[in-house]
Amino acid sequence: MKKIPLVFSGCLLGLVGAGNLLADSLPFLAHAFSLTGLFFWFFFVVYHAIRWQETKIELQQPALLSGMATFPMAGMILSTYLLRLFPAFGGLSQLVWWSAFLLDLGLILYFTKTHVLARPRANATPSWTVLYVGIAVAALTYPVVGIREIAYLALVIGFGLTFLLYPLIYHDLKQSPLPSHLLGQEGIYCAPFSLLLAALVRVGGASLPTWFLLIMVVASQGFYFFVLTRLPKMITEGFQPAFSALTFPTVITATSLKMAQGLLQLPFLTVLVWMETFLCLLILVAVLGGYVAYLRE
């Protein structure tokens, strides 16, 4: 059996994100995804801790290290599941949340020091948005700790870095395109605006102006449909571990649309929510199946 690659962390985030998406509509399936994500999250920690010397060498690659923010992001979402599962043990959920949040911050600071401020600067890739905008998961999950100020700060940082990173990534990829084995990272393009939309709805709720919600929905969906146009090229290249980058972005896009629709109440969006929910689950299961086949080769 092959070594479980670090990029599998993206599937962990996809699994727990799917559990969160289905929590109020298909609770049995939501538990299945969340528990599977919880199991593999802990397994992933132990597996790579045992092989730390190998893992440490792999983490020297900027494109890989930046994508590892999916691990603490999954931890923050898992904390919300633990709170639902064990409401009497709120301290456990808060411990997981704070540990994941601080790990995410530490990863951001370390990456910035070693790969952004260093000269020459590493080429920006789509996974940079996972690292820098992914902190907005703190705003999406802030009720676990109940500190709104963290949510506001995470949103401000997320928005600011989104508008900074897209042009930078575009510029760098024009100079140095993604290699074929990293094409799956193109799935990340739809994640930032979708995550920010979901976090905004969580924090702002009904106080959000309708026009602003619509702008965010259009931005989120625009990048989502762009990603869908890239799928045929990715598929023709054959399965790659980097396909894990397709899981959470499509899940959070469906989640954000569902949350926004709860406020907008536009009939045609209901159909779109169910279509995107089905598609993101199909992608998640297909990628997990691809991993099973890949690891058994």
Language-model features and meaning:
Residues 264-297:
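Short hairpin/turn module used for nucleic-acid contact or packing/dimerization
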Residues 1-19, 54-80, 97, 113-140, ...:
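Juxtamembrane helix-loop boundaries in multi-pass membrane proteins
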Residues 1-48, 288:
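N-terminal signal-anchor module of multipass membrane proteins
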Residues 29-43, 90-105, 148-162, 210-221, ...:
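Structural signature of hydrophobic alpha-helical transmembrane segments
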Residues 49-53, 229-233, 289-297:
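Membrane-interface capping segments at transmembrane-helix boundaries
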Residues 20-30, 82-94, 140-152, 200-212, ...:
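Helix-coil boundary and interhelical linker segments in multi-pass alpha-helical membrane proteins
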Residues 158-216:
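Aromatic-anchored, glycine/proline-accented short structural segments
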Residues 41-57, 98-117, 136, 159-173, ...:
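Hydrophobic, membrane-facing alpha-helical anchors
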